[in-house]
Amino acid sequence: MEEQSEILSSKKEFAFATSTILSQVGRGIMVGLLVGLIVGSFRFLIEKGFHIVQGFYQDQGNLIRNLLIIFLLYLFICLLSAKLTRSEKDIKGSGIPQVEAELKGLMSLNWWSVLWKKYILGILAIASGLMLGREGPSIQLGAAGGKGIAKWLKSSPVEERSLIASGAAAGLAAAFNAPIAGLLFVVEEVYHHFSRFFWVSTLAASLVANFVSLLIFGLTPVLDMPDNIPLMSLSQYWIYLLMGIFLGFSGFLYEKAVLNVGKVYDWIGKKVHIDKAYHPIFAFILIIPVGIFLPQILGGGNQVVLSLTEQDFSFQILLTYFIIRFIWSMISYGSGLPGGIFLPILALGSLLGALVGVICVNLGLVTQQQFPIFVILGMSGYFGAISKAPLTAMILVTEMVGDIRNLMPLGMVTLVAYIVMDLLKGAPVYEAMLEKMLPETASDDGEVTLIEIPVSDKIAGKQVHELNLPHNVLITTQVHNGKRKTVNGSTRMYLGDMIHLVIPKSEIGKVKDLLL
């Protein structure tokens, strides 16, 4: 019976590998519609809830009453978080490392449990005023939705991974109104290559989810910047070089902090004898003073980014905002509540860019009208360095601000920041988070699957028998000049060809590292 099941699964995988573009687009549309509704409503409820909480803090006339309401809300969220995270630990944090782990065959999420628990607790946690982003949870919710559709369709493992990737990209697209960035994020951060197995359905899902989001929120870009920002002359481009170096170093410091904040929480928890499930209470207690005195900088950070181009801030105020948001972003994320670092990183990057911009304006190097470009460049460079996904950073910021004229400066700053981060031996932040959680989540159930990867320059020109593949990995077919042929030990690999491998799910990441 088990052998028949494996044969049926293998037939499904090879059928999916040869499926038409139209069928893959159809699956992508299904995922996009579902994820667009899930993430669109998730985003809508977070925005409404956050405005209510922020309003309580801003209503200074009834502050005592409002603080009592806020305290009761925070207590409820803390108790609910303890209950839900004990029953489903994979809803903690942003969720992006968990999605990466699933796509690499290192774990298998209970899609329904993750979906409804992350949805409810994510809305409450992110709307509470903590400096958490909605984008990481949106990606995990999208991935869970994609897996749900795969289960409903009784898909093969390879098709299931394709739909999970499509859902993840659709989640980012709906959260940021950035469909192309959604596709690129999955390519750069998860797959590290283009594969027909997933990119067609992923793009379709991203576009459809974005369309649903636009129906809910309108056509205005998420971070709508002033029109007609004067471009800087070529003689001023040295500023971009220095800015990229600055953002690269700053990104490295951020990564070190965010990867170690959990240790601080564990140390404090042991000192005061509070169970890990109740660590969010520290974040809630510490966010209250910020809410009382600076309610305008609460939340994920999109309000902060927009305010930088609408008001004139001094260097001292910008530096104060950055320090507070940096520290409280760590406090918020380290609590383990559902919520991401995506938008908080962009907000911190915009503040760093604004700091550079203020210095340049005060020194007479640029005009005040050119100041907004520094806010935009700060977001792209800072996120590109921390994530080590420069293409995603550039396109994401471009889609969010709705202006493509800044691609050259964006590319320069982001590339320099990325290079500095690499020279400092900084790892992609989500991969580093995945490494930290692997001992808890890694699984090896021996289940095999089919994957498709391109022939890289690492293996181009070699014959199959020269690749030294693990004994449980088999290359089955090669697609050369659009024609599919069966592979044997003497088959030569040509750069740009696609090869199909039958492989244990738990070995996906290892084999990709070996061949790509």
Indicate residue ranges for each PLM-predicted region.
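Alpha-helical transmembrane segments and immediately membrane-proximal extracytoplasmic
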Residues: 1-441, 447, 482-483, 496, ...
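Residues in well-ordered beta-strands of folded domains
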Residues: 100, 454, 476-479
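Cytosolic Rossmann-like ligand/nucleotide-binding regulatory domains
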Residues: 459-511, 515
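Short amphipathic
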Residues: 449-456
